[in-house]
């Protein structure tokens, strides 16, 4: 990881908040032979008894499920906004164009849970994203037969996080005028550029 101190958050709560906000992750690992695998899943980020736990579910017997059973060391990559930064936006020339971005890498051991925990994560996931207790797609509206059939195809997991690294690269190494010019230019860009501009404004408050 791009590991420079000026691109690190001073407050660990900001890292946790970022993870919860950007919780559709790339979950990566390797099988026993070292073949890399990855999948993309929504997860929950919880603090339990002083430990950080990531939980979710994946398709049963997929290449990544089988690989994670062989080798439980995994990494969840949390992706945030990102945007191109042009050299022409700096007050001084020849400083090199670059990319601003925000990401967190959380690694640890994955374990697959029992049937009861699977039902709990199914309910939590469905109710969280439906966000409506009266939704016809809510967990409490699912038939027992459907839940039973669905649970045969997936498996729930928990990851006990033992290491977190992050990069919040937001032009912290630029002079004040360049910083403001970068924000102004990004504000004219697409949704990703505008999101980086907002993060840059907030980081200087």
Each language-model region and where it sits:
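C-terminal edge-of-domain segments
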Residues: 113-205
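A generic structural signal for short beta-strands and their flanking turns/coil linkers
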Residues: 23, 39, 50-54, 70-74, ...
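Short, structured beta-strand-loop surface elements
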Residues: 61-121
């Amino acid at each position: 990881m791009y590991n420079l101190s000026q691109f690190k958050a001073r407050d660990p709560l900001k890292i946790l908040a970022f993870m919860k906000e950007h919780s559709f992750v790339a979950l990566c690992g390797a099988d026993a032979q070292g073949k890399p695998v990855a999948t993309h899943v929504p997860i929950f980020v919880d603090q339990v008894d002083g430990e950080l736990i990531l939980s979710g579910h994946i398709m049963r017997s997929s290449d990544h499920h089988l690989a994670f059973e062989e080798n439980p060391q995994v990494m969840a990559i949390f992706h945030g906004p990102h945007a191109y930064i042009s050299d022409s936006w700096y007050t001084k020339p020849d400083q090199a164009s670059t990319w601003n971005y925000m990401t967190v890498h959380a690694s640890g051991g994955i374990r697959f849970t029992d049937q009861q925990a699977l039902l709990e994560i199914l309910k939590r996931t469905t109710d969280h994203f439906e966000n409506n207790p009266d939704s016809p797609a809510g967990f409490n509206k699912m038939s027992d037969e459907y839940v039973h059939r669905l649970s045969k195809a997936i498996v729930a997991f928990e990851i006990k996080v033992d290491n977190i690294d992050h990069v919040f690269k937001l032009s912290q190494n630029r002079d004040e005028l360049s910083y403001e010019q970068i924000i102004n230019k990004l504000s004219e860009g697409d949704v990703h550029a505008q999101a980086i501009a907002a993060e840059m404004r907030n980081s200087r408050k």
